[in-house]
Every structure is written in C-alpha cells, then in structure tokens.
Amino acid sequence: MQQYLDLMRLARDTGVTKTDRTGTGTRSIFGHQMRFDLSEGFPLVTTKKLHLKSIIHELLWFIAGDTNTRYLKANGVSIWDDWADENGELGPVYGHQWRSWPTPDGGKIDQIRNLVEQIKTNPDSRRLIVSAWNVADVDSMALPPCHCLFQFYVAEGKLSCQLYQRSADIFLGVPFNIASYALLTMMVAQVTGLKPGEFIHTFGDAHLYLNHLEQADKQLAREPKKLPVMHINPDVKSLFDFTYDDFTLEGYEAHPHISAPVAV
C-alpha cells in the first residue's frame, strides 16, 4: 500500500505545523486523494499489523445504527471508550445519522437502507450519498464525524465508493478508515449484485500528530508486503444480516505493530 506511505511521507516532509483541539500539535496537509483498486487485494496496511477485529466490529456497529459502546466492549473493541460517557453513550454519532437521520417533522431517514435500494433500482443516480455531518446534531456528539460523507458510483457492473474525510489522523486512524470503507464497498456490492470497483479516499485536513513522528519514521522505513484477500460469506443477501463470522482474511502478512498515543 504505497499510496498510504506516500501520504504519510508527504505530511511528514511538507506538512504545515498547526495547533489542534487536543493540544498535541500536527503536521498537516490539505486536499490529498488516494485510490485503491479492490480487485488487487484488500487494502489492509502491511507496514504495521492492524487489529482487523476492531475494524469489522466497528463497521457492523455503524450499520446497526448503534451509538452505545456496549456491543463494542462485549466484542473486545475499545477504540471508542475514550469518548463515551459513563453509560457508554456517544450521542448521535455515525450509526444514528446513517440509520436514523432526524427530520423536522419528527420522522427519521434510514440513509443506508435507502442507499442500497437506490443502487438496486437506479444505479446511475448521482445521489447515492450518505452523510454523517448533521449540523444540528454536531454539538451533541461525543466526537463529530471525521469521515463525514461518502458516495457510491456504479459503472460496468462495478461499485465504487468515494469517502470525504474532513479530519484524518494519518498514523492511527487512516489505516482503519481505508479498510472499513473498502469492506463496506465489498459488502454493498455483494448485496446489490455488483463487483467491487475502487475505493477513493479524499481528505480535508490530513495530519500526523507531533507525538507520532518517530513512529511514522519507523513505518516509512518498512517495505510494504503483498495485500491479503478478503472473503465474504456469499450466502448473505442483506447488508443488515452480516455478522463478524461472515468475513475471512487470507494471506495477511504484516510487519510488527507500532504503538502510539491517541489524541483525545
């Protein structure tokens, strides 16, 4: 995954030093884009070992419309713990906006269900969009959405996805985001009778935290390995029926994990 290393190197070498909400400081770039052809393998970073279990469970949690960490904690996933309140609540974050976007008249819009139906019935639509950035709810969220809008595109029997990410922690967050949206694209493709096409990752503020520079240098010194292959249970026909056991990763060889502090 040279695309990811190129992003990291660009921020490391040319990024502007900026302050940030956490007080840590960053090296920041703006407006970068990466493309991944999903026929070439599953884009899981190989220059450090990633916890795929967390990525899959978080995505299933989003799709379920959940905003409480109970499900995640029950499955050994702690990535949202730092933002949750004492009851595990996060406010109207991703899952709520994806599945229950509130309307002025008190109704709710299931963006994900509508998206799947539109891909099936009107694949040339230019409105195959899901947004998590609900301005009215942002102040009620434990953490406003970083990956805030994505759009699907159907061409020649293939489904592609473009994500706009307003804020991107290059070292810790971006590898998760790449894998999560690549997997979502594969899942939606399966349930709509399409083949996976490309995942396109477009960034607003992409940054390396200043306390991640040493770790970034270590990762940049490593050579990427061959991408693994993700197998999805072909019997699953609804996006809402997937479980953790429906995914099998084959051939994942990665360099050792590199630890780094999370900026909260």
UniProtKB/Swiss-Prot annotation:
Domain of life: Bacteria
Active site: C146 (nucleophile)
Residues at which dUMP binds: R21, R126, R127, R166, S167, A168, D169, N177, H207, L208, Y209
GO-annotated cellular components: cytosol
Pathway membership: Pyrimidine metabolism; dTTP biosynthesis
Function comment: Catalyzes the reductive methylation of 2'-deoxyuridine-5'-monophosphate (dUMP) to 2'-deoxythymidine-5'-monophosphate (dTMP) while utilizing 5,10-methylenetetrahydrofolate (mTHF) as the methyl donor and reductant in the reaction, yielding dihydrofolate (DHF) as a by-product. This enzymatic reaction provides an intracellular de novo source of dTMP, an essential precursor for DNA biosynthesis.
InterPro entries for the chain: Thymidate_synth/dCMP_Mease (IPR045097), Thymidate_synth/dCMP_Mease_dom (IPR023451), Thymidate_synth/dCMP_Mease_sf (IPR036926), Thymidylate_synthase (IPR000398), Thymidylate_synthase_AS (IPR020940)
SUPFAM superfamilies per record: Thymidylate synthase/dCMP hydroxymethylase (SSF55831)
Record EC number: 2.1.1.45
GO term, biological process aspect, one: dTMP biosynthetic process
Gene assigned in the entry: thyA
Residues annotated as binding (6R)-5,10-methylene-5,6,7,8-tetrahydrofolate: H51, D169, A263
Localization of this protein: Cytoplasm
Family: Belongs to the thymidylate synthase family. Bacterial-type ThyA subfamily.
EC class of the enzyme, as a word: transferase
GO molecular function annotations of the record: thymidylate synthase activity
Taxonomy of the source species: Bacteria, Pseudomonadati, Pseudomonadota, Alphaproteobacteria, Hyphomicrobiales
Protein name per the record: Thymidylate synthase
